[in-house]
Design a protein with these regions (language model features):
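N-terminal export signals
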Residues: 1-11
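Conserved PLP-enzyme active-site core in the AAT-like
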Residues: 14-37, 41, 68-82, 87-212
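A glycine-/small-polar-enriched, mobile loop at the entrance of the PLP active site in fold-type I
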Residues: 28-66
Length: 212
């Protein structure tokens, strides 16, 4: 019977990780920001800030307001909000488009029978995160052809298809940002905004850098 190799001093000194205690194998994350892989690894400064935040209690609404200012300054956006992940961000963005500043509508969600509740979306953009949009009470309306998705052609979404789908029940347009779709974004925004329709851009993996 072979003798077990002696442990080195380094191996003995290295503490067991939380994942080892739970029996969860670690992965090599080559995707970066994907929530389902745990998101990005935290920088030491972030870990320190999280540890400091855990030592006190604050009013979360006040914290969100302060965080919004920091996010806006870092990204160039008008405002920002901290969420638990990409799906939560889509749900909150959809809820904002459904309710706006109407407190009664906010209280009614996800019951959207008395308000515009349809979210337009290119058929080629449909994906598993659609559930996050419907969670807020929205109904997704497919528009356009699925030529690219089926490999039957190269035709993409056109402005007239968006205009034909907009009616009094429309609340927003959802655009999924990928290297293959970004070229259509200016047209989508111009067409939707012309009809007073906000555009939700799912760009969960586009930041950083700030230029995006």
């Amino acid at each position: 019977m072979a003798a077990r190799a002696p442990k080195t001093a380094l191996a003995e000194a290295k503490p067991e990780t939380i994942y080892q205690r739970l029996g969860v194998p670690q992965r090599i994350n080559a995707a970066g920001t994907l929530t389902r892989l745990g998101g990005s690894l935290m920088a030491p400064e972030v870990l320190l800030a999280m540890a400091q935040a855990a030592e006190a209690s604050v009013d979360i609404s006040e914290l969100q307001s302060a965080a919004s200012r920091v996010i806006a300054a870092c990204t160039g956006a008008q405002a920002g909000i901290v969420t638990s992940g990409a799906a939560a961000g889509l749900t909150l963005a959809t809820a904002a488009c459904l309710a706006g500043w109407d407190v009664l509508r906010m209280a009614a969600l996800p019951d959207t029978r008395a308000m515009p509740h349809r979210v337009l979306m290119a058929r080629t953009h449909r994906n598993s995160y659609d559930h996050a949009v419907r969670l807020a009470g929205a109904e997704i309306v497919d528009i356009g052809h699925n030529d690219r998705g089926t490999g039957a052609g190269v035709r993409g979404l056109e402005a007239w298809e968006i205009e034909a789908a907009i009616d009094a029940r429309s609340a927003a347009f959802l655009f999924v940002a990928t290297p293959d779709t970004l070229a259509d974004l200016p047209m989508v925004m111009a067409t939707a905004h012309q009809h007073g329709l906000p555009v939700i851009v799912d760009a969960a993996a586009q930041l950083p850098p700030r230029s995006n």
